[in-house]
Amino acid sequence: MRLQPLFVSLALAAPCALLPTASLSAAPAAAARQADTAPVLVTAAQWQQMASEGRRYPWFAKEQARTEATLKKMMKAGIDVPVPRDKGGGRTHEQHKRNYQALLAAGTLYRLTGDRAYVDYARDMLLQYAQLYPTLGPHPEGRGQIPGRVFWQVLNDSVWLVNAIQGYDAIRDALSAEDRNTIESKVFRPMAEFLVSEPKNYDQIHNHATWAVAATGMTGYVLRDQELVEKSLRGSQKDDKFGFLRQIDLLFSPDGYYEEGPYYQRYALAPFLLFANAIERNEPQRKIFARRDGVLLKAVDVLVQSSYGGLFFPINDAILDKGIDTEELVAGIGIAYARTGDDRLLSVAEQQKRLLLSPEGLQVAQALAANKAKPFDYHPMLLRDGPDGDRGGLAILRMNGERGQALVQKDTMQGMGHGHFDKLNWLFYDNGNPVVTDYGAARFLNVEAKRGGIYLAENRSWAKQTVAHNTLVVDEQSHFNGNWKRGEAHAPQVRFFQADADTQIASATMRDAYPGVAFTRTQALLRHPDLGLPVVLDLLQVHGDKAARYDLPLHFNGHIVTTGFEAEHFPSQRPVLGKDNGYQHLWLDARSKPGSEPRSLAWLLDGRFYTYRFGSSAPAQALLVESGANDPEFNLRREPALLQRVDGQKDVTFFSVLEPHGEYNGTAEYVHGADSRIREIVRTRGSDAEVIELRLASGARIALGVADNSATTSEHSVTVDGHVYRWNGSHARLDRSKGDGK
């Protein structure tokens, strides 16, 4: 017979007990003591509901069984609380991670099953920490300004506390007063005090500080320490300059976009939502989920929208294989669904194949059992950046559903220290794959052999550098000369964004990335009946105050099929492209002579062909390069890129079209549609506007007009081969059918 949770048994037994008069007079004091130790992060009533109903719902029952199996293996292996010695990925580091996971699981399973073995296991582990923690100073492998105690960086200490305090809250009323006092006075309280005492970590607007304030705030609620809660909410000085509330106000845009990008939005989401949940349960009058028009719940939706094929857009410092199945977003989906009842989130939960053993997780399980899931609608959107939404944004253009075409134009803020120097960078996805790529971060997370799992030196020398991205490089220097603090002061200006059924377009201007240089990028995702799939049109206009070298890389995924230009190759030697700012990591494989006529490059990826037609207003070289040079430790992936180079110009315009087409099936041995349906790309300059014309094999012409001044509503005209294109406003789609002279 399954045991009931202990608190359920006590609740049922109390009304039937025959107590002497003296005991009755002591009842209020006993009730007060019980209230002082009762769980507060998840209430006793909520635990009781999960214990009595959870196994009736397959998703919840499966998660509970998985957690039980995992924890029993840990319990069988015995308790191990080692003296901290290692970096990330090392034995002691990984053991302390397993320990906080075990503490959380033990507390949860005690409440769901009533089995005292889980209490004993968690208690004994925490008592060992009570012996260890007072002896610890800065970690011997300490990283950064503030080493941790249990871990090499203080961030991991915060993560430990966020998880462990939840497990402790669940067993606290099952412990003796002596054990509670030992554990709290020697583990949880000194841990929280250590975090609060380090303002360089605690009083910051950054994801590290989010974890710290969530840890101390949740600990404050459990220990009934309102002073600690107030410091967590308002900063260590309680002056509202820092703390959890200020972080909500400054780190998210009104749309729910997080400044550091999707990868770190994913990481920060867990402490934001877990602490917000604790605040809502203990101080509902704060209305934390309503703050800034519900921005925390918006952030969950935005994070899912910032993904393709289940993986997050890897902008800034990002690990490529992080996606919607991460544990942080599992928590986010559960909490957001419980607060909103948005059935679209249930389809994300189905993809995650997991849920939390929490009241929110139970609600998800109940809804899934009732078949309430609806498809999540991935749609085009402009996610404004900055606290007031006026510091650029992330433009997402989409057609043909979840695995169709997605174009991402990165017109965002710098992203603090995790930001890359890639203003107006872009990515493109199609057929379930990244096609125009972003390297992400140079890091092997928690792989000890790769420098302990930290960001590698190549993250700074390659991955952050501008040439590692698909945007303008001037004189082989990175944006803001590679200084992120300078980058924080300057953001792109979004010119316009529009998304219709057949035309989706985004445009932004960047100034001050280079002294005296301004550049504007306009990109469109265009559908046409004579094309099999939507195409990407790209227009990059550069204006400088002196002659310079302009490089425009395109990092792509696939195997080159044809190069539509003559080039010099280097079969006997492989020159390195440059000496610094990322160029030292590029091998030069082929180089064309300068020319102004549009050229092409075609490649094959996962059974689909891609033809890239490109040109420029001034003579340009086409260089084929590959990453991986000057990499003696083999830390970099070998990836191809095309680099257009214009020398000695003040102004230049780059224009291109990327066309997905055809099918290759090696198993069935057939090829369809290997030839591009676009015959020519033509760029024509007018007095105050440009027209890019795509001339199709069918005879039809796709034309896009773009005005220099996006604010104007006046008429613009550009003549192309005797045909006058006219439109009003910032831009217009101006197609012509075969034989159309109008």
Curated annotation (Swiss-Prot):
EC code(s) of this entry: 4.2.2.26
UniProt superkingdom: Bacteria
Stated consequence of mutating residue 455 to F: Displays less than 1% alginate and poly-ManA activity compared to wild-type, yet approximately 8 and 4% wild-type activity toward poly-GulA and poly-MG
Residues forming the catalytic site: 264, 418
Keywords: Carbohydrate metabolism, Lyase, Metal-binding, Periplasm, Polysaccharide degradation, Signal, Zinc
Biotechnology: Is an attractive candidate for the broad-spectrum digestion of polyuronides into fermentable monomers for biofuel production.
Reported effect, residue 207 to L: Complete loss of activity against alginate and its three block structures
One GO MF term: metal ion binding
Subunit text: Homodimer.
Protein name: Alginate lyase
Species of the source: Stenotrophomonas maltophilia (strain K279a)
